[in-house]
Structures are given as C-alpha cells and as structure tokens.
Design a protein with these regions (language model features):
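Acidic/polar, glycine-enriched structural segments that form the non-catalytic walls/loops
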Residues: 17-25, 35-406
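Short, glycine/acidic-rich hinge or "gate" loops at secondary-structure transitions
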Residues: 387-396, 448-450, 512-516, 533-543
C-alpha cells in the first residue's frame, strides 16, 4: 500500500470556533491533535498555498512534529503541572520547569529550579507523628519577570480575565523553550509577550532568558521587574504540602545596577548554592535600574516608554553554583555576549549529543517523536557535558530534574536508564555507576543494620546513600499509621549488580571492574548469600521479608 504522506485541512466552518477560541489558537491545537492521532503531518490551507512543493512541505511539517513539543492554551492545576514537566529545559546539572516568567508558585502553576544532588532532610509533624524526609530542594528562583502598564498598581498576571493566547514550544533538537502569549489588562490594552529560555548544555552552570514585549493596541509607559527570589519553597507534589517545605536560609543577597547575587545554605545537609544574575538590554541604562530589597529577595525595576507595534527586549543570564558539585563551585562567572550567542553554543552541544543518540524511525511519525522526547528528557537529566565533564556525584532521580515526586530519590529505575547511556555515552554511564560505588559503605551499613552481610543498597537513595524510605506510612483512608513495607524491595541491589555487569560486558572496561565494579558485585553477592536460607525439604534456597517489583 502507498503510505500517506500527509493531509490538508482546507478550512473549518465559519462558526466552528468562537472568536475567543480562534484567538486562543484552538484551531492549531485541533489540527495538531488530528495529526498526532492520524500519525501523519497535516497542513493548513495557508501552508499549502505558501508551499512551492507540496511533498517538501509535508516533509518539513513531519520533521517539525518529530522534533517539537507544542502546547496551546492553559488549563491551570494538575494539567498545567504536567505540561510544565514535559517542557522542562535541563543540562544534567540544572533543570527549569516549562513555566513562563510571569508564573509564581501556586496551585495553578509551579516554576522551579532544580540542581542535581541538592537534597535536604527536614522533620515534619503529620497526624500526630514526627517524620523525617529527605527532599529534592527547589532552589532560589531567578526566572520571575512581570510588568504593568501605565500607572497600574498591580502587575499583570495569568488568569482567565487576562490571558488571551498562549503557545509554548520545546525544540527537542536544540533544547530551546519558546512561549508566546497575549495578555490584556482591565482597559483591554493588549500586550504580546515572547519568552525564550535555555539551560546551556555547553556550560552547565548557565541558564538564559530572553523576554520580549510588544504593545498591540496602545502606547504607554511599561514598568518591568525581574526578581532574584530566595523565598521559594517546595510545592510540586500535593500530598507533600503538609510537610516542611522551606529547605534553606538566605546567607547573602546583594544587587549592584544590573547584577544580583544570592547565596543560600540548606538547613540540615549544609549545602550552599550561589546564583549570579545579570540583566542586559538596550531598553534601559544601568543607572536607571531601581533596586527593591526584601529579606529574601531583590527586584530590579525599569520603566520604558513603549509604543504600539514596537518590540522591546530584556535578557537575563543566571550563573548557578553548588558546593556539593565542586567543579561548579570553582568556575568563575563569565558574562555572555547575548542570549543568541548562548543559545547557539548550547545548540551546538545538543547537536553533538544527537549525533550519538538519534535513532531514525521510518514511516511512524509518533514513534519517532516519542523516542526523541524520552531521549531528550534523559539528556536533560544527565549529560556528558555535566555529569561526566564535571564529575557530578549524582544519579538520575525518579522524576529527573523536572519535579519533586518521589522526593527526587534514586530507585532501581537505573536498570531502564543505564542501557541508553551505556550504548551512546559509556563514560557518562560509568559516572552514574560511580554514584553507587561511592555509597557502597552505606550499603554495607544498611545490610548490617538488618543482620545481613555484604552490601544491601537502599530502596530509596539520595545524597549520601542511606535508606531514605519511610518506615511508617499514613493510610489516607483511615488516617492511621502503619508499617511501610516498600522498604523491603531488595531487588534494587540486583539491578545495581546487573548494571555494573552490563557496563563492563558492553564496554570491556576492565579497569572499572578492577577498581569499582568487582567490589560492588562481590558485596552484593555476599548480601544475597546471607539473605537466602536453604530449605532442607526441597533442597532449594528461599528468601523472605521482601517486597517484589510489582509491590
């Protein structure tokens, strides 16, 4: 059978969409949904008319769909949280959720900055019981930008009353996030906002924002503020919100003209984070920046006389350092020439990654797209440019650098993740395995605490390799506490042994096996030897006090 190369959506009936739906890009969202369901590219009538060659136009659209994630509109709450996770930009050292700069922490949306290995343990009182949890920390926020028009007292925010259009796009090939939005105020003054964002893959300490605004139907002074915020807290997971949410104290905060510096230290783990931010643009003079200081945050404020139809741009570079990532702590801050220069540098780094990891699927658009989505998010969570180049002592969390579910802990998921790295980036796979080797002593302590020999790796691992699984579980139906048996999932040690063997088998890295892998295998074998009991009646060994992979 001849494959379908594509389709053309000639038009929708005149009354098919309301004017509000048309403005909100609902037609584009519908066309995309049909293309994904039909597994084939669809052109609009306008795209067909503009295409000199129809077959080339179908192929161009196919390539676009296979390399991009697009979301139209805005559904606050659980749906929005999921979209933000999927639109995360990251480079293995840091991750930024796919929010726009106007968004702040709320039930509707959740901007966050995550740094690999940034954990803190805090006690919380829940239902009469004091529990301790090691959490993946939401680091200080430097992404927030807001504006107000004329003499308005309130900053424009995203709400059903103000939002007219929102389209967010993530380029999987280059790691570039773009958001285009139209907001209106109470006087129906409309302003178009375009945000571009990258986590620089070539320089893992850096992330960059470009923020452009354009008055569509008015001219007026516009006041713009960008914030360095140390008041943020963990709020990503609804069921964790009754736990201690603030994990650090601000230890230093300063601003000088277009530059801010914030330093924080986690409350228990004593890890320091420093963020240096620099705003640039030809829409303001450094001397005209107003500084507004609070106890835990600083705002830089500029006012621009904006004219209808004219675009105005501000750029922000943020340099992130973490004391537990020693090389990042020692790297000096180097200002970039522009957002465009940083984006090109990052795109070149992504190009080298895709040269090794891209798998081409013929004749199945959605399989191709899904493969790239998964590969992209793996590389955003751990990359040769960060984990390997900076020798990060971390592994990949259950939610990557995208969110706080499972408290950012490392489980046995590595058994599904490491084959990707072993195949395409073996040196990065080795660095991820060293995370386990460096915590071998904790695994041996864990085994001894349960009267076993050898090394028993924890079901949930975080900063130092101790068992971070809760011993008690709160039943949400009856409010009673009971034993949490998930701690008995011992197969994580088998997965680690398999991963070490697979790496050696695939790479023939004998030096790794001599220095690290062999010791891990031996200690894990000792654990299972001590955990197994011979049944004299059957002549077979058995294990008990375990929970299987199906939980």
């Amino acid at each position: 059978a001849t494959p379908i190369l594509g389709g053309i959506v000639a038009d929708f009936p005149a009354d098919f969409f309301s004017p509000e739906e048309t403005l909100a890009l609902v037609p584009q969202a519908v066309i995309q949904a049909f293309a994904e369901q039909l597994n084939t590219p669809l052109l609009t009538a306008a795209e067909q008319a503009a295409a000199p060659n129809l077959l080339a136009a179908f192929e161009e659209k196919r390539q676009y769909l296979a390399w991009h994630l697009d979301y139209y509109g805005y559904v606050p709450g659980k749906n929005e949280y999921a979209v933000e996770s999927l639109l995360t930009v990251g480079n293995g050292f840091l991750g930024l959720r796919g929010t726009t700069p106007e968004m702040t922490i709320s039930d509707d949306h959740y901007p966050a900055t995550y740094i690999a290995g940034l954990y803190n343990t805090a006690a919380s009182e829940v239902a009469g019981q004091v529990v301790e949890n090691e959490d993946f920390v939401n680091a200080p926020d430097n992404q927030h930008i807001a504006l107000k028009i004329g003499d308005a007292t309130d900053w424009l925010t995203i709400s059903p009353d103000t939002l007219q259009q929102l389209h967010r796009q993530l380029n999987l090939k280059t790691g570039l996030f773009v958001a285009e939005m139209i907001l209106k105020d109470a006087d129906n003054q409309q302003i178009k906002l375009t945000t571009k964002k990258i986590a620089n893959m070539a320089q893992p300490n850096d992330y960059h924002l470009q923020y452009t605004f354009e008055p569509l139907n008015f001219s007026a002074p516009i006041t713009l503020k960008t914030v360095t915020d140390g008041s943020v807290y963990n709020y990503n997971v609804a069921r964790y919100r009754n736990l201690t949410a603030k994990h650090f104290q601000v230890t230093a905060l300063s601003a000088q003209e277009n530059k801010t510096v914030i330093e924080v230290c986690t409350n228990q783990s004593n890890l320091s984070v420093r963020e240096t931010a620099l705003i640039t643009g030809d829409i303001f003079e450094k001397e005209a920046i107003m500084i507004q200081e609070e106890a835990e945050k600083i705002a830089q404020v500029v006012t621009v006389m904006a004219h209808q139809g004219t675009r105005y741009t501000l750029e922000k570079q943020v340099f992130v350092q973490a004391s537990h990532a020693e090389q990042s702590w020692q790297v000096p801050f180097t200002p970039k020439d522009s957002f465009a220069a940083a984006a090109q540098e990052s795109a070149r780094a992504w190009q080298t990654l895709w040269q090794q990891a891209n798998i081409t699927v013929t004749g199945d658009l959605m399989s191709q797209k899904l493969l790239r989505i998964h590969s992209y998010h793996l590389l955003a969570s751990a990359s040769p440019f960060s984990n390997q180049a900076q020798a990060l002592d971390v592994s990949i969390t259950a939610r990557g650098l995208h969110g706080e579910a499972y408290r950012g802990h490392i489980f046995w998921d590595e058994i599904f993740i490491l084959p990707f790295y072993i195949q395409h980036y073996p040196d990065t796979a080795k660095q991820l395995l060293l995370y386990r080797y460096h915590r071998l002593e904790k695994a041996k302590e864990n085994a001894a605490a349960s009267q076993y020999r050898g090394a028993m790796y924890p079901w949930q691992s975080g900063r130092d390799g101790r068992e971070t699984t809760q011993k008690l579980h709160l039943n949400p139906l009856n409010g009673h506490w009971g034993e949490d048996h998930s701690i008995l999932q011992r197969h994580v040690s088998l997965a680690i042994a398999y991963n070490a063997w697979l790496y050696w088998h695939s790479t023939q890295d004998h030096e790794f096996m001599k220095q690290y892998g062999g010791e891990m295998l031996l200690e894990i074998a000792q654990f299972w030897n001590s955990a197994a009991t011979l049944d004299d009646a059957t002549g077979r060994f058995f294990i008990d006090k375990v929970m299987g992979p199906d939980e």
